Amino acid sequence: MAYRFQGFLYGILFLAFFSLLSLFISATLTPFLSPLIIGILLGAALSPFYPKLNQHYDIQAGITFGAKKLLRLGIILYGSYITLGEIATLGLNGFLISLFIVAGVFIAAIFIGKMLKLDNEISLLVGIGSAVCGAAAILALESTLKTHPSKSSVALGFIVIFGLIGMILLPAIYYANILPLNDYQWGIFIGASLHEVANVVGAAAISPESQNVAIIVKMTRVVLLVPLLLIISYIIFKLNQKRVQNDTNIPNGDTHAKQNALYIPYFAFGFLGVIVLNSFIDFPPVVVESTQFASKICLVFAMVALGLQIDWQKFISFGAKTFALALILFIILMFGTYGLVYIMF
């Protein structure tokens, strides 16, 4: 028992070291990259050594704790970045454009993934990462679907690439004065189209008005993660039920009942609860900032743990089609969002 706890502790300390390193690199060397992204890159670089590390130090329990428990806690605490009052300032059109983007891009990912004959789970992961909020959304859906880390990693890889492209491309277009948009409209455009919160903050620095609006639009998309996760869970449950009814070879019993049970992502309600608390209780700034930092730490832990568990053979096998899906969704995001902004604002 003591040996197993020691292995668990080694796993947590391992994640802590590389999580703190990710935060340091992000803050000093690469401020344009989220520490979450740096975390998964460090984990991925170390993944070939993970089997031997686990064999010698039995760190699996600590790594699993980081990848699952701390992930969910991080998503719950992520609600501290958002208030309902900020979302309300956008008005109906601001909410609708976020809703159209999230729903449209996610549905497009499902159909385009089928056309490309891509793995269903990867299509969903790339779809939610593009539609909602990049890494955090992919991690939340991974926890709901219980997918293999390699699938999440390949989805994250291409979301990072196109998020960075968008972060560079949109300010370049703004300064070239190509599109007939004012700063407010640019804020809507950037907030509704880019993948990561960090991408939005970086790209929207073109003006104070654009940045304020862009962040609120982005957080509105983040809030829509909750109903989307619940809808996905319910649809998967119904599809599993239908599959079981059509397959007479599947045995009945407790094990089967568990496999076919409706999974409710309770952490999504926790996320929503923190948003509500943050909206109606005037917490001291130190409490809000500490909660936000705790969320970031938990999510970086999860990203390092996820990167460690990458199966590179699977990662490579999913590569080309996943790139194609992420590219098509990026084009849809750019042109679709611009069209909606032009029409609605």
Curated annotation (Swiss-Prot):
Q: Which Pfam families match?
A: Cons_hypoth698
**Where does the record place it?**
Cell membrane
Keyword Protein biosynthesis listed = no
Q: Which UniProt keywords apply?
A: Cell membrane, Membrane, Transmembrane, Transmembrane helix
Topology in the lipid bilayer: Multi-pass membrane protein
| One Gene Ontology CC term in the entry | plasma membrane
Instruction: Give TM segment ranges.
Output: 7-29, 33-50, 90-112, 122-141, 154-176, 186-208, 215-237, 262-281, 293-312, 322-344
Q: Does the keyword Amino-acid biosynthesis apply?
A: no
List, alphabetically, the InterPro entries matched. UPF0324_pro
The UniProt family comment states: Belongs to the UPF0324 family.
Q: What is this protein called?
A: UPF0324 membrane protein HH_1161
List the source organism.
Helicobacter hepaticus (strain ATCC 51449 / 3B1)
